[in-house]
Amino acid sequence: MQERIDAYFDTLARLTRGAEATDRGGKPLALARGFEIVRDAAHAAHDGGNKIMFVGNGGSAGIASHLAIDFSKNGILRSMAFNDAAALTCLGNDLGYDNVFAAQLEFHARTGDVLIAISSSGRSRNILAAVEVARNKDCRVATFSGFGEDNELRRMGDVNFYIRSREYGFVEVAHLALCHAILDLDMGWGAKKIEAKRAMVELDG
């Protein structure tokens, strides 16, 4: 059993560290550059009186809600998710489930906002529709996907993060870890340790 546990967490770590970032044209980006694009877009939105919006289904919806409160409370960045039960059931009933997020973006999105679109498969119609609305409203878009490398969502963001796995658990946890890393590193996680190491190297030199 321990070998399987070790293999599980080794795989999760490998997939997260191996996350692939690309631009809208499919050009590979360094992961650090991908993080910078999201960070800069988030700060530009906040400074301009705009907001960050998160969308996802199922486990990805949980991630969206989790991140919206963390980006708001810890990052001091205006953020929201669209997972209210009344809104989802109303819009799903009236407009169809493919439109539950797109309709809310029509209500709330403004030029200069940022959309974080999360889908393990990268093929969820309601997520793709939400991105289309965000694009039409001149929002910045970051996507998080997995499963097939040719999924549609991966080609729709200003920056696109992809986890090379077809296992829901691995993809979802990696997506959450990446988003947390973007926020936590922006807030200075590890900076003091790095500065201390540099100081030690300079002293030794």
Indicate residue ranges for each PLM-predicted region.
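Conserved N-terminal alpha-helical segment that immediately precedes and caps sugar-phosphate-binding
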Residues: 1-205
